[in-house]
Amino acid sequence: MVDFEYSIPTRIFFGKDKINVLGRELKKYGSKVLIVYGGGSIKRNGIYDKAVSILEKNSIKFYELAGVEPNPRVTTVEKGVKICRENGVEVVLAIGGGSAIDCAKVIAAACEYDGNPWDIVLDGSKIKRVLPIASILTIAATGSEMDTWAVINNMDTNEKLIAAHPDMAPKFSILDPTYTYTVPTNQTAAGTADIMSHIFEVYFSNTKTAYLQDRMAEALLRTCIKYGGIALEKPDDYEARANLMWASSLAINGLLTYGKDTNWSVHLMEHELSAYYDITHGVGLAILTPNWMEYILNNDTVYKFVEYGVNVWGIDKEKNHYDIAHQAIQKTRDYFVNVLGLPSRLRDVGIEEEKLDIMAKESVKLTGGTIGNLRPVNASEVLQIFKKSV
């Protein structure tokens, strides 16, 4: 296990009706709030009305930024920054999933930066101060409710990049599993794939001495595998929704990463797909992941796929190691396609070979020419993975 510093500062209020703490907690940080949300589902399901009622009862003045895109755009961030500056906003509250939360995070950071918000996405060292952030989660997927990251799109440059700062972790997040009952099946499926991908990114590491972290990762993967299908069949199954929601947070809040050397790969590949084609993030991950697994499988990496196959999928450990590895990868593909109902090919979401080369090059541009940890891949290898996925 490698050395690490531990800090997961976000306070979590988990369970039914935990929204009732909203007023009390917000007032710790200010009395002027910007509410950031997406396409209006929170108004249809009553979450918006409940939140606004609480703010009004607590004499908290609020402003709104609606219409955050599924792949949030820097132009939307700019709108939020303008609202905050014109009204002296003190706290940014996201209500929604990862898109709303990520947008809120960059707004909170950009408010304190005298320049173009895209600057702080390109260079996180320019972030010096961040307005307090809070979130009410409505979908289990990105884990933004408990991490320090945000992913933002620039449609002018076809870039989808990560902004990060320790103070971008929400001060608190409210996780009520009942708020995910009305999430459409396609979003539940894509969200489950996203959670699993976050785990894969840190699980498939060449740190062989992180026994504890790997066993926790396997438990979270088994949780997703068990409850993803149940949530699709029974959208109001509380235990399924609760387990997926908490798995979302634990998958990416650092718990699985501390003590390991990690370097993400599939996410950076997928960011190029959704930067150029604006596809659903979790769908792109589900398509790429099995093909990436097959590509990096070799004599040096097979041991990790054996661990994965035996401990996550229950494959007989006495089998040939490569048989276990291939079976585990196939089970992963089958789960994404047959249980979650996600597409299996890039062409299914409108991506052909036209831009694969440029996307492959862009995926490694900011990482020294390679991505990944267990077996790093370069641009030409990413291109091969893309081609296998078409």
Curated annotation (Swiss-Prot):
One of its GO terms (cellular component) is cytosol. Pathway: Alcohol metabolism; butanol biosynthesis. PROSITE patterns: ADH_IRON_1 (PS00913), ADH_IRON_2 (PS00060), AMP_BINDING (PS00455). InterPro entries: ADH_Fe/GldA, ADH_Fe_C, ADH_Fe_CS, BDH-like. One of its GO terms (molecular function) is alcohol dehydrogenase (NADP+) activity. It comes from the Bacteria. SUPFAM superfamilies: Dehydroquinate synthase-like (SSF56796). Its EC number is 1.1.1.-. Keywords: NAD, Oxidoreductase. GO terms for biological process: 1-butanol biosynthetic process. It is an enzyme of class 1 (oxidoreductase). The keyword Oxidoreductase applies. Primarily NADH-dependent, although some NADPH-dependent activity was observed. Homodimer. Belongs to the iron-containing alcohol dehydrogenase family. This is NADH-dependent butanol dehydrogenase B.
